[in-house]
């Protein structure tokens, strides 16, 4: 499902070469839940951006759903992001002027243009809000009328709109209190176990990381170690 092969990412600062990632190898199976941990500057976000086709490696190969993404052009990368990956961010990134329902409809508008009716869009968006466990009575609320946890549920529903096989979550509980954060992680776990989504979570919180089946620890751009928490194959 997701494969990084000898991936290196460098940036140039003056005459100095900075290694954000250094010869990283990673395999994530379809339907797996993997957490990525490490201190600030360890390369967590860079790795997630490369997996999410938001950035390209300096060296190495990246495969998403058996598609090598290195040589894809911008339009092809956009299609990969649109169809195969749902993004969940720490700060929710909802459009403040739109309702919860309209925020979830946006990916459907971009994908289907006029090929999906407004009624079909609304039905799918409501389905996604239900999957994200947000009560329908909040569908017409704007983000500033929702709690942080409710906003993150809307963001998860938006990530599900185009039914991608992969969910990438960058510090999904970072802006939430611990109780609400745990509920959000339980939701991601449910989407993984019941709907078969491949989930990759970047976090600095070990309690969040332990929702995964294994934890990849990064340090100075390299995979320092891996911890297996429970058996993916034995589910």
From Swiss-Prot:
Matching PANTHER family: ABC TRANSPORTER ABCH.1, IMPORT ATP-BINDING PROTEIN
All copies of domain ABC transporter, residue ranges: 2-235
Protein name: Uncharacterized ABC transporter ATP-binding protein MJ0796
A single BP term in Gene Ontology: transmembrane transport
Disulfide bridges in this chain: none
Gene Ontology cellular-component terms listed: plasma membrane
Residues involved in ATP binding: 38-45
Key word ATP-binding present: yes
InterPro entries: AAA+_ATPase (IPR003593), ABC_transporter-like_ATP-bd (IPR003439), ABC_transporter-like_CS (IPR017871), ABC_transpr_LolD-like (IPR015854), MacB-like_ATP-bd (IPR017911), P-loop_NTPase (IPR027417)
GO MF assignments: ATP binding; ATP hydrolysis activity; transmembrane transporter activity
Family according to the record: Belongs to the ABC transporter superfamily.
């Amino acid at each position: 499902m997701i494969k990084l092969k000898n991936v290196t990412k460098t940036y140039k600062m003056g005459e100095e070469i900075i290694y954000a990632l250094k010869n990283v190898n990673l395999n994530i199976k379809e339907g797996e839940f993997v957490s990525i941990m490490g201190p600030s500057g360890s390369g967590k976000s860079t790795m997630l951006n490369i997996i999410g086709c938001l950035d390209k490696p300096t060296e190495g190969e990246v495969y998403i759903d058996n598609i090598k993404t290195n040589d894809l052009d911008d339009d092809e990368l956009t299609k990969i992001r649109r169809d195969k990956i749902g993004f969940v961010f720490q700060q929710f990134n909802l459009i403040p002027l739109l309702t919860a329902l309209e925020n979830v409809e946006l990916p459907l508008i971009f994908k289907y243009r006029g090929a999906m009716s407004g009624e079909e869009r609304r039905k799918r968006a409501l389905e996604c809000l239900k999957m994200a466990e947000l009560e329908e009575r909040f569908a017409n609320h704007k983000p500033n009328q929702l709690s942080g946890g409710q906003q993150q549920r809307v963001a998860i529903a938006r990530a599900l709109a185009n039914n991608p096989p992969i969910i990438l979550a960058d510090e999904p509980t970072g802006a939430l209190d611990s109780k609400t954060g745990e509920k959000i992680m339980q939701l991601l776990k449910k989407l993984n176990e019941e709907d078969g989504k491949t989930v990759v979570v970047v976090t600095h919180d070990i309690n969040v990381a332990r929702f995964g089946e294994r934890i990849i620890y990064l340090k100075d751009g390299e995979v320092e170690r891996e911890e297996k928490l429970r058996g993916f194959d034995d589910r």
